[in-house]
Amino acid sequence: MTTYALLHTIFFFFVYAFLGWCVEVAYAAITTRELVNRGFLNGPICPIYGCGMTVMIAVLGRFTMPSSDMAWYQNVLVAFFGGMVITTLVELVGGYILYKMFHTRWWDYSMYRFNLGGFICPRFSLLWGLGSVLLMVVVHPLLSKPSAAIPTLVLIWLDVIFGGLFLADLIVSAIQAVGFSKQLARIDELRKAMRTTSDALTEVIGTSACLLYTS
């Protein structure tokens, strides 16, 4: 992998982590009629989506992009089954690690049939497969074109800024999860500032999703 390709991979991790957070907020607003700031972190980001898409791009990208030699229906099949397997594994491993580290579940499929530990279930695996088709066959090719025009220096700065914010949020959220944030006033202030921003986005995205769903 070239340096430029690595920079793009990091960039797309943050792009899809943010888009995943938006999807989670919209889904929660539509299904529960409540505005819920989803995710483990305080900022508007769900890293598990970024991880899933990064792996899918690396593994499935050359088979699902329009430039591949396969027919369109083959692209769709590869994206569906490959994406379903990858996202299910990411969800299982990610959910298990988070539960073991923080003794908290950020999603629970225990109410669905044939679930495994509440971390994965066939119903959502199928949904992830459909979502993978949309992302790999439609969304990612569209995003790849403008992102390819980003100069290397700009891409470096974007990755550094997003990476710094992500690392700070990760540390603050981990401290909060183990219950130390109350003893560290500055950490708690930083957490609240991050949460305020993502709460504002939650209201915008959740309200918009409900309006679109009911219109």
Task: Label each PLM-derived region with a short phrase.
Residues 1-7, 61-79:
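Helix-coil boundary and interhelical linker segments in multi-pass alpha-helical membrane proteins
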Residues 3, 31-58, 62-65, 100-140, ...:
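Functional transmembrane or membrane-interface alpha-helices that line membrane-embedded catalytic
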Residues 4-11, 40, 75-78, 115-118, ...:
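Membrane-water interface of alpha-helical transmembrane segments
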Residues 10-26, 47-55, 59, 63, ...:
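Hydrophobic, lipid-facing residues on alpha-helical transmembrane segments of integral membrane proteins
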Residues 65-71, 142-149:
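Membrane-interface helix termini and inter-helical loops of multi-pass transporters
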Residues 149, 174-208:
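Charged, amphipathic alpha-helical linkers/stalks
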Residues 155-183:
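Alpha-helical transmembrane segments and their immediate juxtamembrane interface regions
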Residues 213-214:
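Conserved small/polar residues in nucleotide/adenosyl-binding loops
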